[in-house]
Amino acid sequence: MASVPSLASTLQQQLADALTAALPDAGAADPLLRRSDRADFQANGILALAKKLKGNPRELAAQVTAALPAGGLIKDIEVSGPGFLNVTLTDRAIVETLAARAADGEGRLGVPLKDDAGTTVIDYAQPNVAKEMHVGHLRSAVIGDAVVRILEFTGENVVRRHHIGDWGTQFGMLIQYLIEHPGALQHEGGPGDGASDGEAAMSTLNRVYKESRALFDSDEEFKARSRDRVVALQAGDPGTLELWHRFVDESKIYFHSVFDKLDMEIRDPDIVGESGYNDMLEETCRILEETGVAVRSEGALCVFFDDVKGPDGNRVPLIVKKTNGGYGYAATDLSAVRNRVQDLKADTLLYVVDARQSLHFRMVFETARRAGWLGDDVKAVQLAFGTVLGKDGKPFKTREGETVRLEDLLDEAVQRATAVVRDKAEKVGLSEEEIVENGRYVGIGAVKYADLSTSAVRDYKFDLDQMVALHGDTSVYLQYAYARIRSILRKAGDAVPAAHPELELAPAERALGLHLDQFGEVLAEVGTGYEPHKLAAYLYQLASHLTTFYDQCQVLSPDNAPEVVENRLFLVELTARTLHRGMALLGIRTPERL
């Protein structure tokens, strides 16, 4: 199915052609088209053009208007103010364009693939081995997953990377404990479902961590053996590596159980942790030192920046290799840049990482550019995100002041949502199985939407009462909008959705139709700027237009002519398909009945 040009892009082209025809001296002028309250669109470009040509803007506007093709797209065009063009489109053009979108059998609603698709390596969802995931891990996972879905929909080749924390001195302590307590990682009972297996894995890892830490802090001989074990691990001792792999594998069971709850796909080949770059660290440091990008300072290998200074005014370096010979995080991150550009052929590197790490990544990117690993043809972007706050506006903690476990947060969201679904279940006729399933979809959707409807860089308050509210800017409001349309379509009987371009549209129908047509342009903007909150805003506005449409336009009224019923069914069905597709791109499910 060929892509469908939006009404705005078609009008933009017609106006640009008219500008060229009427004012050949203007060159390639931009009409500066935008949506307007005065008409469907307003073009403001003539004002600047008149200054350039030293002409009367209203007279120039009249010349451009005369050069526009008659009929078809434009119903009315009015010159207002100092040469603004207020353009109203024909109802036929709106319905015919929407009909072309509805006819797209590939489920893309006529949205084109982008012309300049490349390869993006996106680094997101980065938990730590042998440690529980907490609320701080939520945003990278949710934002990253949505960006992956959106980029892939636009045609980008996306390579996912989960840079898990799977290396470090703490593994000496854990592995040494396992050597001295061989059964420490065994679970009680047999295998269960993914969630219970994950819970058992984390429970075991927690116990081993606490017991090994207690021994490490109290027993000097065990501490010495643990430090020797770190040396053996870093030297690649096979027996030590085998036990290290057990901790990684046990942690992956837990990771997958949490991501399954989040309704996210995490694939093992995409999990490339810190250890995945160990073989590159020495070469990375050697190249940096040989090229003069990094220099020795007090025994450490450092990269300095004139604009990065501490409170004392001295330059603060990026430490690539420590005085004791150990490698800093920067060495791993720089090795990852080399791998992703040279081996994975990325032309965009995208890091979905906490805003508090912005300075680190700015220094890493600049170092990589100095070393020639990031050329002018490769873009490196940190998609920085803010903090999850509690209702009190402070970082989200338990009542005891502890960090909130991510699983507990998700479980509570599902419980709250299930109660909301159950309240409506009898009226809709939901089975217990549907109540449980919808509760999961609504709860997880509420958590994701609260995050994604906020600009990533901003902090946001985690308020479950607000998240599962049936009204306002929430995912459940959008899910109910979708389910209501599906209910109308089931009740339509013999009437079928069908476009009728010959009909005159009511104001609410026009507003809904014009908004539906913007879907592709919104996705293009969201994909370019990595801003899923703009897609969330578009979907909320779509649901709001739908509510106005219901208030002003009866769909299945017996007073309506058959063609009016069919046309309105067509509009709501296309709205449902757009909601379904848009929510799926945010990683949120849309139940058929709710």
Curated annotation (Swiss-Prot):
CDD domains: Anticodon_Ia_Arg (cd07956), ArgRS_core (cd00671). Keywords: Aminoacyl-tRNA synthetase, ATP-binding, Cytoplasm, Ligase, Nucleotide-binding, Protein biosynthesis. Monomer. This is Arginine--tRNA ligase. HAMAP family: Arg_tRNA_synth. Its main location: cytoplasm. Gene3D superfamilies: Arginyl tRNA synthetase N-terminal domain, HUPs, Isoleucyl-tRNA Synthetase, Domain 1. NCBIfam families: argS. Its EC number is 6.1.1.19. GO terms for biological process: arginyl-tRNA aminoacylation. Belongs to the class-I aminoacyl-tRNA synthetase family. It is found in: Cytoplasm. It catalyses: tRNA(Arg) + L-arginine + ATP = L-arginyl-tRNA(Arg) + AMP + diphosphate. InterPro entries: aa-tRNA-synth_I_CS, Arg-tRNA-ligase, Arg-tRNA-synth_N, Arg-tRNA-synth_N_sf, ArgRS_core, DALR_anticod-bd, Rossmann-like_a/b/a_fold, tRNAsynth_Ia_anticodon-bd. One of its GO terms (molecular function) is ATP binding. A motif ('HIGH' region) lies at residues 127-137. It comes from Streptomyces griseus subsp. griseus (strain JCM 4626 / CBS 651.72 / NBRC 13350 / KCC S-0626 / ISP 5235). GO terms for cellular component: cytoplasm.
